[in-house]
């Protein structure tokens, strides 16, 4: 019995009964999922690592299975046709927004992101019809972010939101990519939602990158030429953001 229980836990199931259920699901065409486990203070380092990695894998599989493909297609087309993309995010989502802006620039898409919420609102006020506000938020309920989104909409920009379903931000969005995931019960548990946001943006980036190959290649060559010149002149000491 102890050996069986250790095996079950190692593959992310709660016990023999849970393993049989997951196995039966796999044999009937379903997928054996990775169970979500809460991190406890009493956990060993090995248990901590297993749970964190297992939770990340579980969240990624859930995103794959519940992704709204129609909304994804609409989001890719919206970004492809945008004259300018303004990224809006606060808190930990700012890191995600900054990463996406770099991706958009690499794809030759005019984009901007300001970490300061007031600067975001000022920049949103300069948007025009044909522009897109890409908004990233776990809760979709922060007042300052919602205010900035309304400013962008008032200027004629369309809103693409990556946030929780049913949130105030979700209700404002022209196109919504839903991310719902409960966080752990400890402050030091990594934010799985942030990883899901990054994965969602990776999906969008790949969707954009598979088209307009000539434009993408031209932008990449231009950037590489600029970085090479900066390296030669000694102005770039730590390489570009692609390195």
Where do the language-model regions lie?
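HTH-adjacent hinge/linker in prokaryotic transcriptional regulators
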Residues: 1-71
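Generic structural signal for well-ordered, non-membrane alpha-helical segments
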Residues: 16, 45-49, 53-56, 72, ...
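Glycine-rich phosphate/diphosphate-binding loops that line cofactor/substrate pockets in enzymes
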Residues: 70-82
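Glycine-rich phosphate-binding loops that contact phosphosugars or nucleotide phosphates
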Residues: 80-199, 203-212
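A short, charged, Gly/Pro-tolerant segment at domain boundaries
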Residues: 214-243
């Amino acid at each position: 019995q102890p050996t069986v229980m250790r095996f079950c836990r190692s593959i992310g199931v709660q016990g023999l009964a849970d393993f049989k259920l997951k196995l039966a699901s796999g044999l009937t065409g379903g997928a054996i999922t990775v169970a979500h486990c809460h991190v406890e203070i009493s956990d060993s380092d090995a248990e901590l690592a297993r749970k964190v990695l297992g939770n990340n894998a579980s969240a990624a599989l859930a995103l794959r299975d519940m992704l709204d493909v129609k909304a994804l297609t609409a989001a890719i087309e919206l970004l492809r046709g945008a004259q300018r993309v303004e990224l809006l995010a606060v808190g930990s989502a700012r890191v995600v927004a900054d990463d996406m802006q770099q991706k958009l620039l690499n794809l030759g898409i005019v984009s901007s992101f300001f970490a300061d919420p007031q600067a975001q609102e000022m920049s949103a006020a300069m948007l025009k019809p044909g522009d897109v506000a890409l908004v990233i938020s776990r809760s979709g309920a922060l007042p300052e972010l919602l205010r900035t989104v309304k400013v962008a909409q008032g200027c004629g920009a369309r809103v693409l939101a990556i946030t929780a379903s049913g949130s105030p931000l979700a209700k404002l969005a022209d196109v919504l990519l839903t991310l719902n995931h409960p966080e752990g019960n400890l402050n030091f548990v990594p934010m799985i939602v942030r990883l899901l946001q990054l994965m969602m943006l990776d999906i969008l980036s790949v969707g954009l990158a598979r088209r307009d190959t000539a434009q993408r290649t031209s932008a990449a060559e231009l950037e590489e030429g600029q970085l090479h010149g900066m390296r030669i002149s000694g102005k770039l000491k730590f390489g570009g953001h692609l390195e």
